[in-house]
Amino acid sequence: MRNYLTGKERLLVALLAFILPFSFAKAEVKEDGKTGQQGWYVGVEGGMPFGFSTFSSFGHDKTRLGWAAGLYGGYRFNSIFSAELSAKYGEMNLSAQDCCVERNYWLGSDGMLYNAGVLGMDSWEYANLKSHVRMGWYGARVNINLLGLFHQTANSRWDLAVSPHIYAVTTKADIQTISDDAKVMKGSTNWHLGYGADLQVGYQLTSYLKLGIYSGLTRLTGERMDGMPEYLHKNNFLWESGIRLGINLPFTNNK
């Protein structure tokens, strides 16, 4: 099997491997005798993903909003570090970009790109097609609360976190006509390594409930997420923004 890890991807894996041990460090006791909250938590999250591949969520005809929802659970080690596992499912619709429509590209039933319709073969103009993508994310992230680095904000109800993540991502793309959603090509399930980072802002509503928003990028290795031939466009990534609702479990320790 071809090795999809580039130098940048290896660097991200090494960075996570470097950061994770620090996440297990015991919270330091501050001068006022307080420490950051420690303990287990779970939550739900939902967002709107946008896909960028040969086709794009920002297509030639309109912008198409995707949706995603999932569960997460993790452990907060101190006021700076937490780590979590998550699972999420979502769907998107992507269509051709302006440049591909202007060049009058066609997709043949053999999955290849053509500059015109092909005699004796079913083929479709890019301008008339969209890719319906179903996705699953399964992975881990480390949250680094930047406000926890400063004494004045370490125990604030607010947090501002940078969250590197690594996912195993599944995609399955069916090619459909825009006009009537007729399926012209059925896709197969592909597995990808997904890597990237989120920026999160959260607020502790009560001792148990936390509300947050997030936005981040995830790059995918391997096959095109949209099931289209790779030509000109090298992009293969997601941009997702959404909300999170977390619950501190009863056996969380507040020190």
Task: Identify the function of each model-found stretch.
Residues K34-V42, S79-F81, G136-Y138, A154-V162, ...:
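Outer-envelope beta-barrel architecture signal
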Residues T54-G59, W124-S131, D180-G187, M225-H233:
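Extracellular loop and loop/strand-boundary signature of outer-membrane beta-barrel proteins
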Residues A14, F24-G43, H151-L160, P250-K255:
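Outer-membrane beta-barrel biogenesis signature
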Residues M1-D32, G36, V142:
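Bacterial Sec-dependent N-terminal signal peptides
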Residues K26-G74, T171-A173:
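Short glycine/proline- and aromatic-enriched beta-strand/turn motifs that initiate or cap beta-hairpins
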